[in-house]
């Protein structure tokens, strides 16, 4: 019996480490049920990518369960483009995320949108990996 407990304990520790590292690398939380997660966009696009749908569905579930909170959807861009263009693109991204959530049954009155354009980068390096991290919409309680 002791060996089983030891194996089970090691398995849980390994699973936790793997999950934590993997989620951090992807910019996700370990437990999507207790946190709103950001979504990402392709270069110069505001349409919701199919690989971001699961994140939005998780966010919708959280918002439905916590309808006493209003959520701000913040649109962001990478540094390429003029500040004016990026403010408009960030706005389109935030509105696209809001529209998706409304289509999932979220009350539009619980959601507000704002664009920060390129002003609040997640990553400050001038390379494609950072640009991809900065093309996002964040959801704040």
What kind of region is each of these model predictions?
Residues 131:
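Catalytic phosphate/metal-binding cores of nucleic-acid and nucleotide-processing enzymes, i.e., regions
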Residues 68-76, 91-122, 135-141:
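A non-catalytic structural micro-motif
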Residues 124-127:
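Short beta-alpha junctions and helix-cap segments that line functional grooves
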Residues 1-5:
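N-terminal secretory signal peptides that target proteins for export/translocation
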Residues 51-58, 84, 88, 92, ...:
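Extracytoplasmic/secreted proteins, especially bacterial periplasmic and envelope-associated proteins
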Residues 6-70, 138:
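Periplasmic peptidoglycan-binding/tethering modules of Gram-negative envelope proteins
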